[in-house]
């Protein structure tokens, strides 16, 4: 991957892609639940 086209970005390289949506629909609730479960460990009964 040398810079043979220096002015041009890679063709399919937008920020919001189907892959971005698929990653974040899994990653955002996962991080949320990990933080929630970690916080539950410190709740005193």
UniProtKB/Swiss-Prot annotation:
BP GO annotations? photosynthetic electron transport chain
**Residues the record lists as N-acetylthreonine modifications:** 2
* Cofactor list: heme b
Q: Which InterPro entries did the record assign?
A: PSII_cyt_b559_bsu, PSII_cyt_b559_CS, PSII_cyt_b559_N
Provide the alphabetized UniProt keywords: Acetylation, Electron transport, Heme, Iron, Membrane, Metal-binding, Photosynthesis, Photosystem II, Thylakoid, Transmembrane, Transmembrane helix, Transport
Q: Give the molecular function GO annotations.
A: electron transfer activity; heme binding; iron ion binding
The family annotation for this protein states:
Belongs to the PsbE/PsbF family.
Concerning NCBIfam families, the annotation shows: cyt_b559_beta
Q: What does this protein do?
A: This b-type cytochrome is tightly associated with the reaction center of photosystem II (PSII). PSII is a light-driven water:plastoquinone oxidoreductase that uses light energy to abstract electrons from H(2)O, generating O(2) and a proton gradient subsequently used for ATP formation. It consists of a core antenna complex that captures photons, and an electron transfer chain that converts photonic excitation into a charge separation.
Q: How does it assemble?
A: Heterodimer of an alpha subunit and a beta subunit. PSII is composed of 1 copy each of membrane proteins PsbA, PsbB, PsbC, PsbD, PsbE, PsbF, PsbH, PsbI, PsbJ, PsbK, PsbL, PsbM, PsbT, PsbX, PsbY, PsbZ, Psb30/Ycf12, peripheral proteins PsbO, CyanoQ (PsbQ), PsbU, PsbV and a large number of cofactors. It forms dimeric complexes. Part of a photosystem II (PSII) assembly intermediate complex PSII-I; crystallized from a strain deleted of psbJ, it forms monomeric PSII before addition of the oxygen evolving complex. PSII-I includes 3 assembly factors not found in mature PSII (Psb27, Psb28 and Psb34).
Q: What name has this protein been given in UniProt?
A: Cytochrome b559 subunit beta
């Amino acid at each position: 991957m040398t810079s043979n086209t220096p002015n041009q970005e890679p063709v399919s390289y937008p920020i919001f892609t189907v892959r971005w949506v698929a990653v974040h629909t899994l990653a955002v609730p996962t991080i949320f639940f990990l933080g929630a479960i970690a916080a539950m460990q410190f709740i005193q009964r």
